[in-house]
């Protein structure tokens, strides 16, 4: 029996009334994963034994009636550490790495009796926008298996969209939650930088990385964020949680809300059908009582260039720790210490990871630092200032999540620049440390279109308010791919 069409609140009521047990729900989730996994390849590891053991322990002590997520299974992106469960970052380099600790976000969820069901596939070390750079093979889009699911949190998005799990965690460095959420027609939130601890997240770009949430609905997304958000002494960049309940404004109307629509977000390079869908969504917000006005974010056009200098520079530093000495893969054909380093990194990293390490090393090198890295930091400040000017007069920014719908597998992965441009609309949010959400807003060419809502720092409850108002008066979130029902 499958429970994948039940809401979290419905599942909670079933668990509290003992109509089902946490063990039965966990086994049903494992069955849902197995029934769909061959088609979508969303998981690197299904932690069947550990999940069932955790569920049995929860059943033994009893479901907490006051804890909505008690006994609920969830999936975790494979770059987020899980105690005793393989955490590979979808790389040969960490093919056998089993952490002895949980990331703070995972520990927070487990403390609320949530059950880790498995680790989801992703672009290697979170470097990619299509889900195709994984050592474990490409994840497929839940709606059309010939299309990419987006990246880098490809498996976390596809798992929710295909009905394998109801909730999952991902990470977002330049759009890695919002873009796959858009491509798969689900809800994905990147919180304000520092809202969720990065302790236990395998680092890519430390000034950009943020753990976030995937779900079927806006309210469930906020409910999961309530659990994982926390200040953490183990992460010096974490911030006090300023919102007691991220669901607090859900259900409130948005009359009088001022929403900005940047002209740059609907300009050159945006698919005409995507543009039309977003303009229709803007009109819908106006019908709900909001004011939508065109604004300009003039420096957003430099976002991709700035991001790939800063993120690659940080990655080249962060990935120095993977050397074949301490953990993970080690090349066997080494004659000396230098050979171990060179051969291990040459054989252990995929092409995209190597490309970004080389780009970052070049940007930080003597003679080029001022021209590239320093200049990128200065332009990053201009991008931040653009947002600050808009948010002085507006509550939120609206636009498409991605320039297009999901594209064909094995097309852009041979053209790095074209692939990088797919993150054009999400990258500025990371550069500024802002919260952003993608919600389903319609379809183009039979594939989901994502609407992105961006707010000032620590405005997640307002973002959820507007997103929920849109969701409550449309039915895009109710439409599911064929595979969700088990047929393929």
Swiss-Prot record:
Domain of life: Bacteria
UniProt xrefs under InterPro entries: Amidase, Amidase_CS, Amidase_dom, AS_sf, GatA
One annotated GO molecular function: glutaminyl-tRNA synthase (glutamine-hydrolyzing) activity
Gene3D superfamilies to which the protein is assigned, alphabetical: Amidase signature (AS) domain
ATP-binding as UniProt keyword: yes
Reactions it catalyzes: L-glutamyl-tRNA(Gln) + L-glutamine + ATP + H2O = L-glutaminyl-tRNA(Gln) + L-glutamate + ADP + phosphate + H(+)
GO cellular component: glutamyl-tRNA(Gln) amidotransferase complex
Keywords tagged on the record: ATP-binding, Ligase, Nucleotide-binding, Protein biosynthesis
Top EC class for this record: ligase
Active site: 77 (charge relay system), 152 (charge relay system), 176 (acyl-ester intermediate)
GO BP terms: translation
Quaternary structure (record): Heterotrimer of A, B and C subunits.
Family listed: Belongs to the amidase family. GatA subfamily.
Protein name: Glutamyl-tRNA(Gln) amidotransferase subunit A
Organism: Streptococcus thermophilus (strain ATCC BAA-491 / LMD-9)
Lineage, broadest ranks: Bacteria, Bacillati, Bacillota, Bacilli, Lactobacillales
Gene responsible for this protein: gatA
